Amino acid sequence: MRSSRNVTALFGQGYRNFLDLLYPRRCPLCHRILRNSHQLICPDCAGDLRPVSGPRCYKCGKPVNGDEEYCRDCSAHPGAFDQGRGIFLYDDRMRYSIMKYKYFGCQEYSRFYGKALYIYGKDLLAVWKPQIIIPVPLHRRKQRIRGFNQAELLAKELSQLCRDSCRYCYSKKVPCYPITEKTGCG
């Protein structure tokens, strides 16, 4: 029995190595191939990460001055959600990375972003103590176009790290326009 487990483990490792060779993991910020398949980000880009710190908007989590409760955007246009948190400053590199993740099929970025959510959100997770993690649903038409729902993949990664369950309780019946189309940003 023991030797069959070893053979299975060896086969599994060989299969993962083959997949790494065929589809190498890439850095989510610079998109270069990572030397080590266990890395989630290259060392150069790891030093460039800029986590959000200090006072934040109570609504969206963007950095604000110490005496402000809400950022300019949330003061002008309250969103349809109660509270959100970003973990990194949304600069050009982060915007490019998220665009590659969502629209160009870079599903492997889920491991990096899930782990980053866990590491940089540990304090908030300790306060919230979630029992389940529910991803934001994606309309089936958008999911067909993208091939996956990034919120679902992030929820799975985060729930594994938190040892919580990830449930899919909702489905989106009505398609909506991307935020960039609503605001004219992009």
Where are these regions (language model features)?
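Glycine-rich phosphate/pyrophosphate-handling loop used in enzymes and phosphotransfer proteins
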Residues: 1-186
